[in-house]
Amino acid sequence: MILEWYWLALIGFITLFLGVFAVWKTQFKGPEAGIKPRMSDFARQAVTKAAEEHKIKLDFSADSIASIDKILEVFCRRHRAEPIAEKELSRIVLTWGAYVGTTLIKHHGGEWQRDSLVSGAYTYPIVFLKPITSNADKTIVRLSEAVPVMWCLKRIRHGFTESVAMRYKNVVKN
């Protein structure tokens, strides 16, 4: 009799937990929920800023990433002359990094995340799951990340040796 109550209580608890989880999942998507639309907004802003402020047309093609290096060189020179305030620098790298990342996702898949397993919190990586091997029993995947926002930050701080276009090509190649 006690054993029956135990199982009934356990089943009831599991059912309650699954119900609460289902409600939570539909109403609260967690910190990752708004990242994709925010990064899409930043990417659209990059296209507008490139045209208006730099007279460069961006079209979300892989070839357009070289233009991002040219734009970031302007910020690099400005930053060397007088350091850009951190808040403004964050906005700059989010805008241009979002464009690079959106282009990468468009052509090669992946998904925006807020935090990186490698680079840390608020670095906005793109996460890729790539199948390595597959057989009837299992598929082994490799998890990899690209951090275009951080690429843009390094490009501004360190100059042409931190080319965003080269990093993009390396990610695509691998």
List PLM regions with ranges.
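Short, exposed beta-strand "edge-strand" segments with a Pro/Gly-rich flavor and a Y/T-containing core
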Residues: 1-2, 53-62, 135-140
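Feature marks short, highly hydrophobic, charge-poor N-terminal signal-anchor/signal peptide-like helices
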Residues: 1-10
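Core hydrophobic alpha-helical transmembrane segments of single-pass membrane proteins
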Residues: 10-19
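N-terminal low-complexity, intrinsically disordered segments
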Residues: 21, 28-91
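Extended, well-ordered protein cores
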Residues: 22-25, 170
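Amphipathic protein-protein interaction modules
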Residues: 87-147
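A recognition module on extended beta-rich or small alphabeta surfaces enriched in W/G with H and D/E
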Residues: 126-174
